[in-house]
């Protein structure tokens, strides 16, 4: 989907804002954006989830990857991967046909800002205490989770109910990651 000129300008401004900021204060700056993203996901609902009960599916969210990662340095790459995968999922042409374009553009902007915030922290190397293998295993688990979601959408031929089930699943997983971010902030 071609992004509108206004969205491109917004992305450029957000990119400059995050690259010009000093320090990595992720839990404070990132949590509000996560809440806005959740609100946008809720607003994107087009049909009742109750009408799609037959399409429910357990995607196997890798909750242990988020439940066991209590240090910021261990969590940031996993959160980054999750948000990148959400961005990729909702950036497809099949996705743009399923959602209101204005809400989708706002959603992209929020995700893009969060990706920039996380990338700034990764670049700064916020404490490299985890083993690379643990981080890679966690990132791989997130990628497999999103592969299952993508496969489900293909099998359901990107139906409105399939997208609604996926939207609800993304809200649930995003909410869990937001709770993790808030617990990180409270530990600082």
Swiss-Prot record:
Documented effect of changing residue 57 to R: In allele alpha-2C
InterPro entries with a match to the protein in the record: 4_helix_cytokine-like_core, Interferon_alpha/beta/delta
The keyword Disulfide bond appears for this protein: yes
Keyword match Magnesium: no
Cystines in this chain: 24-121, 52-161
Gene Ontology cellular-component annotations: collagen-containing extracellular matrix; extracellular region; extracellular space
Function noted in UniProt: Produced by macrophages, IFN-alpha have antiviral activities.
Subunit organization: Interacts with IFNAR2.
Name of this chain's protein: Interferon alpha-2
Species this chain originates from: Homo sapiens (Human)
Encoding gene, per UniProt annotation: IFNA2
């Amino acid at each position: 989907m071609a992004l509108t000129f206004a969205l491109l300008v917004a992305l450029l401004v957000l990119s400059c804002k995050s690259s010009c900021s000093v320090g990595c204060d992720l839990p404070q700056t990132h949590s509000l954006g996560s809440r806005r993203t959740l609100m946008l996901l809720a607003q994107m609902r087009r049909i009742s989830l109750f009408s799609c009960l037959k399409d429910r599916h357990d995607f196997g969210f890798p909750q242990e990857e988020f439940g066991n990662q209590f240090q910021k340095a261990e969590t940031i790459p996993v959160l980054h991967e999750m948000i990148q995968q959400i961005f990729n999922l909702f950036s497809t042409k099949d996705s743009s046909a399923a959602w209101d374009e204005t809400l989708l553009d706002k959603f992209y902007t929020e995700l893009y800002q969060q990706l920039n915030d996380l990338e700034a922290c990764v670049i700064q190397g916020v404490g490299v205490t985890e083993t690379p293998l643990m981080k890679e295993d966690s990132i791989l688990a997130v990628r497999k989770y999103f592969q299952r979601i993508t496969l489900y959408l293909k099998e359901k031929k990107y139906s409105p109910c399939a997208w609604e089930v996926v939207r609800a699943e993304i809200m649930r997983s995003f909410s869990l990651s937001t709770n993790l971010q808030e617990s990180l902030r409270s530990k600082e």
